[in-house]
Amino acid sequence: INDGWQNVYNSGSATSTTINGGQQNVSSGGSATSTTINSDGWQNVFSGGSATSTTINSGGWQAVYSGGSATSTTINSGGQLSVFSGSAVDITQNSGGAIETDTSSDLSGTNAKGSFSIAGGSANNMLLENGGSLMVLDGHQASDTTVGSYGTLGVVSGSVLRGTTTLLDKSRLAGDVVTNEGNLYFLNNSAATFIGTLTGTGSLTQAGGNTRFSGQLSQDGGIILQSGAAMTMDALQAKANVTTWSGTTLTLDNGSILTGSVTGDNTGAGDMTVKGASVWHPDGDSTVGALTLDNGTVDFHPLTTTRLTPVFRAVSLTAGSLSGNGRFLMNTDIASHTGDILNVTGNASGNFVLDIKNTGREPVSAGTPLQVVHTGSGDAAFTLNGGKVDAGTWEYYLSKENTDWYLKADASQPGTDNPGANNPEPPVRHTTTSADAVLDMATAPVYVFNSELQSLRFRHGDVMQNTRSPGGVWGRYTGSDNRISGGAGAGYSLSQSGMETGGDTVFELSDSRLAVGAFVSYTDNSISHNRGGSSTVGSTGGGLYATWFDNDGYYVDGVIKVNRFSNELRTRMSDGTAVKGDYHQNGFGGSLEAGRTFSLNENTWIQPYIRSTAFRAEAKDISLDNGMKAKAGATKSLQGEAGVNLGMNLEIAGTVVRPYLTTAVSHEFSDNNRVRINDRYDFTNDISGTTGKYGAGVSAQLTANAGVWAEASYQKGSNIESPVTGSVGFRINF
């Protein structure tokens, strides 16, 4: 047949046909025997048709469709057999011959590798070259496939590759999702690329050549680079352990992330480059030849565990040399004197940042240095992100000794116990932010309680004129902003807002009155630590009071009060890790105040007074989620105060208004509140000191039984400054 066609129909047959640029169609019931297909020749075997002993030469093509069959086809170099869900058996595939099919077909025959077959959705020992291809369909599998030059292995999601899948130079692996349960073997492939998801329990081996992978890659059996192979991970999310031979290269580029160890073998170790936004997570001990960071990151941090879990273990990275610029994110557990280490056996050059995470647990031997970097030689510079690392109670700093870098507990002369000629001062140690937050929170109940337990005037307003039989109810809102520096911590700001309400019964005595009552309170207290973090204290309280005042202006007021503090400690370690610890605490206290009101003239009065306040919060064990533990001893406060109020009685539009000024001085005597951190270090929260108080207020008698008041004050002392404290309230008599 020369450029014509031949149709073989039912019961028809064709024998020894030669097709030169023409076409032979074998339909149902027809048969063709000993057909020779030359260049541009074409044989179609349709459903029900059959072809036997066909020879396909260069440029020829035999197509077997669903329901059609071919037996004893010989494919010579340049020829192609295409089987589309049909059957082709006893095939002889000579070198350079191409087979195009999928795993829904039935095939058997021999090739340069030996016997091959496709049956029941399983392809075995297929050879795809010179335009040949195999599509592995969903639920099917292909084992021991070899993809030669210009061959294609297509994989549909849900199918599996088994055995050894070999991809030679100029071959192609195609598929959005490829599951490999065997060994995917790239052999001297000069420019292989794969874009998609490669997953499975198998392994990937590259011998020589260059490959580039994009998308996602997960191979439980790992990756092996050998014989000068060069692999580039380009925008790839990869999870696999990598073994590199000497002379190979692995490059992470364009934001790639590799999770897994990289190690050498008995030939040595290959080189590795991490570029740009790419990150390498070595989750096991690793060894590379030359390590180059081009603004890349090596992150030792485990992705599925934290440094506080029992499975935490240190990881070492050994490199023959180091160059470039980049970051190393590392874990340490200084408490057990272990941590990740970067070991450069040869020359190191460039600038690198160490971002080190540690725990809040206390080192057994404080101040003992922990090595994090070793270099054999070179001028590499390492700096510590944030300048410090938290280790229990104390901060650690990065110190260079020769070509090694250590974490040490003080900045001036790390590790020096005694001053010497070159170190005239003792070592300086600095507490961590976690320790500071614990020390801050230990004093907070004192300031919360004392702010709630304000003077008699805050509770009753103008009590002598506004408290009468048989009694009444009252309430007030209070708010304050306090800056506290007392104690062993770095200090904090305390913002308080809350309500207090109560009621009393007033007894008329011969020359005096006695008010006996009860009250409840709640305040919300926000704490901003000076070194970072925002904690809260919710304070719920209640108490009893009794106030006596006679007709000559004398008064005595006593209060007892209990509180329940709900503490939520929140801060951040020096590496930015959030830290928290929640606990409850009980406290109780009271105050006793006495004074007298003198009339200076018909409308002006003065009221000197003295006051004492005492408070005690229970001891408490505190645990933070970074491993720090603390025991706050019983926190005590004892204050004495003397002051004077000066006011006037005015009548405005029929309403009695009493503006007043107040000034006082108080002294805190408590100087020995103890806190023990990590069962090792004792701190004293000394909150003693003198404070001056200044304020102004006004009360107004709206009706015979109802009054309101407001007061604002300022106080400043050695340990506290309150730029503004305000209170507004009311009282209604029965």
Question: Which residue ranges define each predicted feature?
Answer:
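Thr-biased low-complexity repeat/linker tracts and other Thr-enriched repetitive architectures
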Residues: I1-S77
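Transmembrane beta-barrel domains of outer membrane proteins
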Residues: S214, T345, M464, S495, ...
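Short secondary-structure subsegments characteristic of cysteine-rich extracellular domains
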Residues: P363-G378, G489-F507, A630-S637
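Outer-membrane beta-barrel and related beta-rich outer-membrane complex signature
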Residues: T368, G487, S528-G532, E568-R572, ...
